[in-house]
Regions:
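Interfacial helix-loop-helix linkers and transmembrane-helix boundary segments
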Residues: 39-48, 66-67, 81-82, 102-117, ...
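Hydrophobic transmembrane alpha-helices of secondary-active transporters
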Residues: 34, 57, 84-109, 243-246, ...
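Alpha-helical transmembrane segments
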Residues: 167-185, 295-303, 326-327
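Transmembrane helical segments that form the transport core of multi-pass membrane transport proteins
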Residues: 223-310
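Intrinsically disordered, low-complexity non-transmembrane regions of multi-pass membrane transporters
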Residues: 1-19, 25, 71, 75, ...
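Entry/N-cap segments of selected transmembrane alpha helices
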Residues: 32, 108-129, 280-307, 358-362
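Alpha-helical membrane segments and immediately flanking helix-loop junctions
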Residues: 88, 96-102, 117-127, 131, ...
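Membrane-embedded hairpin module used as a gating/binding unit in multi-pass transport
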Residues: 175-251
């Protein structure tokens, strides 16, 4: 009888119920909200579902993120090994490879002025950097946090790893991916506030056709120019352009399909679950996390506003040929931000089709965010 009693006692002690804290319950509730938003309302489920489930797992069973050196037998938890690939910047670079294989740079090639809108939207990054410094973060931590303003999860993870800011990598990544998912909610009020209905109704001229030669030369030229000026961007820009060269060359169909489908989705699973697993209650529920989340929101709003305002300047300079709404797509949430530009424009005029025009600034924003990350790395002497 004593044996049975001891066995039952041990079993009860091993359950998660005996170890759950109030903080764990809060994070489990947050994970469930994320799952609800992703499944019920379709808020970027490819991102939110794995992130939320990783969040759920680590707050029920913390040892799933146990570091190998902290383990009695030298074996870490499953998601710890996924997370190591984040720290080594492998997964963010592979994400860029997949994004490149899926991206059409045609709108950007056809309208190079889109680069200016993509650059303007990066203002949010530097606003976040100054804000983080003002809040007492170190210069490297501020730089890592600031990339949230570009709404670029992989680049946020990449820079945090390179600057050795692993203590705040989890909150940075969750904030960046959350704001990427919430683009359809955050951006429209800002876009409508800064534009008139007349501006939102502006119809833009159809983009010129882009030749196959231009499409092939673009990733090669961008790689040479950007990586020569900022060699530290090579892992991101290089992989982005390699993926795009796969797509546009037309001679490596199998590589294109693998990079844009199977590999991409495998990496999303690994990246999403490992990012979610960094949000244990002990690591996530603190004032620094709240500051990071707040800074990210402010930075993203600033980036959106800067893009729209620069779009208004271009509208004035071209005598009404540019719809300012496409400026908000300069953040690098591809293709969510471009879809939002299309949606807001269509609300003003259902016959207005802005998607392809917005894709120019959108893909320019991807390059711009990577360049901003490379600039910070160069400033801090990181290779």
């Amino acid at each position: 009888m004593e044996y049975i009693s001891n066995t039952l006692g041990n079993l009860i002690d091993q359950t998660a119920f005996m170890n759950l804290t109030v903080g764990n319950l809060i994070m489990i509730a947050v994970a469930c909200v994320f799952l609800y938003l992703a499944i019920r309302h379709g808020f970027e489920p490819l991102l939110l579902v794995p992130i939320a489930f990783g969040m759920l797992l680590v707050n029920i069973y913390p040892d799933i993120m146990l570091h190998a050196e902290d383990s009695a037998n030298g074996t870490g938890g499953l998601l710890y090994y996924f997370y190591v690939l984040d720290e080594w910047s492998i997964l963010p670079s592979l994400i860029f490879l997949g994004v490149g294989a899926m991206t059409d740079f045609g709108p950007l090639i056809a309208n190079p002025k889109s680069f200016l809108l993509g650059a303007a939207a990066q203002f949010g990054i530097f606003a976040a950097y100054l804000g983080a410094m003002a809040m007492g973060f170190s210069d490297k931590a501020a730089a890592a946090i600031s990339i949230i303003g570009g709404a670029d999860g992989p680049t946020s993870i990449f820079l945090a790893g390179k600057l050795q800011q692993t203590a705040i990598l989890g909150p940075i990544a969750v904030a960046a991916y959350s704001y990427m998912s919430l683009v359809p909610i955050i951006q429209p009020p800002i876009m409508k506030l800064l534009t008139t209905e007349k501006e939102r109704k502006i119809k833009m001229e159809q983009l010129r056709p882009v030749s196959k030669l231009e499409r092939i030369l673009f990733p090669i030229i961008v790689t040479i120019v950007v990586c020569t000026i900022l060699p530290t961007t090579a892992p991101l820009v290089g992989m982005l352009m390699l993926g795009n060269l796969f797509k546009e060359s037309g001679v490596v169909r199998q590589l294109t399909e693998t990079a844009s489908n199977a590999l991409m989705y495998i990496v999303v699973i690994l990246l999403g679950t490992s990012v979610g697993a960094t949000t244990s209650a002990e690591a996530f529920l603190n004032w620094d996390t709240l500051k990071i989340v707040a800074l990210g929101l402010i930075a993203f709003a600033f980036g959106t506003a800067a893009g729209v305002l620069f779009g208004k300047i271009m509208c004035w300079a071209t005598k009404g040929k540019v719809n300012p709404l496409i400026g908000s797509a300069g953040v690098s949430a591809v293709p969510m931000a471009a879809r939002v530009s299309q949606k807001v424009g269509a609300e003003a005029d259902p016959t207005n089709f802005l998607l392809m025009h917005a894709m120019g600034p959108n893909v320019a924003g991807v390059i711009g965010t990577a360049v901003a990350a490379g600039t910070f790395m160069a400033i801090f002497g990181v290779k």
